[in-house]
Structures are given as C-alpha cells and as structure tokens.
Amino acid sequence: MRPVFHRPVCRFAMSNHSIKTPCVGLCSTVYGDLVCRGCKRYHHEVIHWNGYDEAQKRAVWVRLEQLLVQVMVAKLEVFDPLKLRQQLEQRKIRFVERQSEYCWAYQLIARGARVINNLEAYGLVLLPEFRDWDLPQLRDAIDREFFILTEAHYQRYIAPSFVRELTEQRII
C-alpha cells in the first residue's frame, strides 16, 4: 500500500536541519553543463560555493528565488501561506524560511507530487489552465521552465562577462 501524503508522518520526510546550499544532489555541471539541472546554480557557483562569503551566497539564493517565483506564480496561487508552512513543518519537508511562499510551494510539489490529492489542503490552488494537469506532470514542467529560464539568464547576463574577461586577458 502506498503512503498517503495527508498522514502526519510520511516516508519522504527530511531532517529539520536548515538548508545551507541550493544543491539537491543531482549536479549536472560535472558532465559539462553550464547550469546545474538540479539546483539551477551556474557552474562557477557550484565550484566556488564553499569559498563564497554570505553576501555572495545570498545573491545566488535571491536570483534562484526570483526566477523560481516567476515560474510558480504562472502556475498556482498560494492562498494560505500559514497553512502551507504548517503542512511543510508537519511533514518535515525542508524549506528556506526567508524565501517566498512560492518557493515553499515548489518544495512541497517537488517532494509530494505523486502522493498529494488535494492541494487546497496545503493552502494552494492551481490556476485554471493547469487544473487538469497531474502534479508530477506539473512538477516536471515547473522544473523544466525553471531550468530554461535560468539558462537564458546565464546566457544573457553571465556568459558575456566571461567572454569579455577572456578577451581582456588576451589583450594584456
């Protein structure tokens, strides 16, 4: 019998330790990706993360939050952030407290898409154009769109500065 997500204890519960890195343990930068398909950080951020000061880490967290929120608000509404937070805590799903409730919603869907039957019980409602979607399908679409948006951001704002730096190094 499959575990039912609305029970107080679920099999996919995680520890209550705070999240110190965006890493989700699926780093694709080791295979040459410029943007990690797991955590959506840029390759140089993955490599240098442990050397970053708090301001640098915060800048990465903020960018990831802004891009993810942009994707999430186009798919669902968080109508009760308190209920969502309570459900995350009750189910021991880790989330970054200072982030938007839309990032919290992503954590819920990422961890529970296959077992959630009623999103409203978590303080969420899908926008009309997504109400017929299965949650695993929606989760995959969100992840794909988040990756594409992050990759586009990299190409627009980060890659040109790398090219400029390389060009300047050759001139000197």
Language-model features: where?
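Short flanking/linker segments adjacent to small metal-binding domains or redox-active Cys/His motifs
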Residues: 72-130
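Polar/charged alpha-helical tracts
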Residues: 55, 66, 82-86, 90, ...
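Sequence-level detector for tyrosine residue identity
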Residues: 31, 42, 52, 102, ...
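Extended hydrophobic/Leu-rich segments
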Residues: 1-4, 10, 95-96, 119, ...
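C-terminal, charged low-complexity interaction regions
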Residues: 115-172
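N-terminal cysteine/histidine-rich coordination modules
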Residues: 2-77
